[in-house]
Amino acid sequence: MKQKAFGVIQSYYKHSPVYGGVFYACFFSMHTRIDIVLCGQQSEEEFLLVVDAIYDRLCQIEKLGNCYDADSELAQLNQFAAIRPQPVSHELYNMLAFCVDCNARTNGHFDITVHSTDYTPDLISKVQLSPKERTLFFQHPGININLSGFLKGYALESIRDLLRSYEVKNALVNMGNSSVLALGKHCLLYTSPSPRDK
């Protein structure tokens, strides 16, 4: 078990000379339990580095887009963007622009302003993103952006990129049983007994 700054990563590793290693880890992040299974020829230490990187990345994403964390960038924007245009970090700006575009592409069914005071379906049109200045301004008081319907999917795509960078080809990542990423071969194949093992 490895102690981290904001929680605990619990892990288990099993190695087979025939199939390689299976590494399991779990920890809490983004208000849910994260379960990770990694399979391949990497060592336990190499897999733990991957999980550490995933944990750190999820903490980073939370600090950007968790509107329930008063210290997050998004919470600060929600507080001040109706007063004057607020500068936005590159990554969060791209998230917001993507979500506003999704609202248009889904005919309003995906809406990050749905938790706003006095919400109406056209309230998102009052969210002004300025790409040149990279700022956010609310043209109506009471707007509150909530990325909860987006953030886990975004996190899984970030995890996919991390797994590729660490050359992990077989993985299963479960975020609270609601958002799942599966890559490569079924990890249970790595633990199935071989006829040669009998």
Task: Label the model's feature ranges.
Residues 190-198:
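Single conserved hydrophobic/aromatic residue that forms the stacking wall/gate
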Residues 164, 186-189:
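A glycine- and small-aliphatic-rich helix-loop capping segment at beta-alpha/alpha-beta transitions
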Residues 1-148, 157-171:
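A contiguous, well-ordered beta/alpha segment that forms the leading edge of an enzyme domain
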Residues 177-186:
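Beta-rich nucleic-acid/ligand-interaction surfaces
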